[in-house]
Amino acid sequence: MRDAYYLIQNEMAQMKKNIASEVSKLEFEKRRELFAKRQTIMNDVFKKAQDKLLNFAKTQDYIKLLKNYAGAVSKILKKSGTVLYICKRDEGFIDVIREAYGKICKVEVSDSIKIGGILAVNKVMSLVVDETLDSKLEEQRNWFEENSKLNIF
C-alpha cells in the first residue's frame, strides 16, 4: 500500500513538472510572438515616418530647414575647416547651404545620409554636429522603444 502511495506521489510530481514545463514553453513562445508583433508594428510606424520625411525633403519648407540647420551649425563650429555633409539628393542646394552657413566651408555628399539634413564636422575643434533627419528619426525610435509602453513582461 505504501509503495502504491509513493508511486502515485511520484507520478503526480512528474505530471506537475511536465505541466509546468509545458506552460513555461508556451509562455516563452507567446512572448516571442508578441515581441515579433511589437517589432513589426514599430518597423511599420518608423517606415511611414521615414516616407513622410522623404516627402517633406521635396518641399520648400525643407530648404528653409536646411538653411536653419546651416545657420545653427555655424554658431557652434566657429573655426575654419568645417565640412558639411549632405545627402546626394540635396546637391542642388549646396549654394543655399553655404550662404546660410555664412563662412567658408566645404559641402560634400555623404552616402550615410539617406533622408536629409546636415552633418557638420570640424576636425580643428574636434566637434561633430548632427542635424540629419536620419539621426533625428533614429533618436525618436530609441525614445519610442523606451517610452511606448509596448513592454513585454
Go through each PLM region and give its residues.
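Elongated, mostly alpha-helical coiled-coil "stalk/stator" tethers of large membrane protein machines
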Residues: 27, 33-153
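Charge-rich, N-proximal long alpha-helical rod segments
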Residues: 1-21, 25
